[in-house]
């Protein structure tokens, strides 16, 4: 076999490997449903104006699994939004004043944002994780989002599966909270309500309630 033929064969093999490296991730994305949704410029503007970053990500790349989201309206949810929410087939998991926890799928995000009575919306988490929230904490969270004070620090009592340690503290800090005191598996922390979704992601936390 001549040197020229050998070089040509090696070049073709290298080209094939390069093409495979480029197209394999794209093919995998198609096979596993990792397809980015496209929106019109007005819809993109709505996502930037009314949705938090995690909710925008769900709208663009989410699948079909429902999740809980916080929605803040201009008017009282029970008195003024019940009929509209019913027509849109959205499930209200809880509500207080102008704020509601809705069960959404990614495809319902933009239609919700198009409602002129909606002020803002934020991703919260899988519905089953709401069971870790004390009812009074959930209502306080709704009240604070409605009043626009969700960024202010609040005291929370976190109950862990055991006494916890450095890894648990890193998760608490990553959610925007700081540890005030510890008593065995019970930690008193302080931070903004906007950090609750990240706290809920930790399987080490079994329950959350308002701090005394």
Show which residues each predicted segment covers.
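N-terminal secretory signal peptides that target proteins for export/translocation
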Residues: 1-11
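Residue-level detector of intrinsically disordered, flexible termini
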Residues: 2, 20-21, 121, 174
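A subset of signal/propeptide-processing and intrinsically disordered low-complexity segments
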Residues: 3-5, 18, 47
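Generic detector of short alpha-helix boundary/capping microenvironments
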Residues: 9, 17-18, 59
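Compositionally biased, intrinsically disordered low-complexity regions enriched in proline and serine
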Residues: 9-11, 24, 40, 208
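Bacterial N-terminal signal peptides
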Residues: 17-26
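Autoinhibitory N-terminal propeptides
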Residues: 30-212
């Amino acid at each position: 076999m001549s040197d020229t033929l050998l070089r040509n064969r090696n070049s073709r093999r290298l080209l094939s490997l390069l093409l495979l490296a480029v197209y394999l991730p794209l093919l995998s994305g198609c096979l596993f449903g990792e397809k980015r949704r496209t929106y019109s410029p007005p819809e993109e503007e709505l996502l930037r104006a009314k949705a938090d970053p995690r909710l925008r990500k769900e709208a663009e790349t989410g699948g079909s699994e429902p999740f809980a989201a916080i929605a803040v309206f201009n008017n009282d949810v029970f008195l003024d939004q019940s009929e509209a929410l019913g027509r849109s087939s959205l499930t209200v998991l809880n509500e207080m004043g102008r704020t509601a926890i809705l069960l959404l799928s990614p495809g319902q995000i933009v239609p919700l944002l198009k409602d002129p009575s909606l002020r803002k919306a934020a991703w919260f988490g899988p519905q089953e994780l709401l069971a870790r929230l004390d009812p009074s904490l959930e209502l306080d969270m709704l009240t604070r989002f409605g009043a626009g004070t969700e960024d202010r620090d609040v005291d929370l009592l976190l109950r862990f599966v055991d006494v916890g340690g450095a890894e648990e503290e890193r998760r608490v800090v990553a959610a925007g909270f700081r540890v005030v005191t510890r008593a065995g598996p019970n930690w008193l922390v302080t931070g903004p309500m906007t950090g609750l979704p990240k706290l809920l992601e930790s399987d080490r936390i079994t329950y959350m309630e308002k701090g005394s």
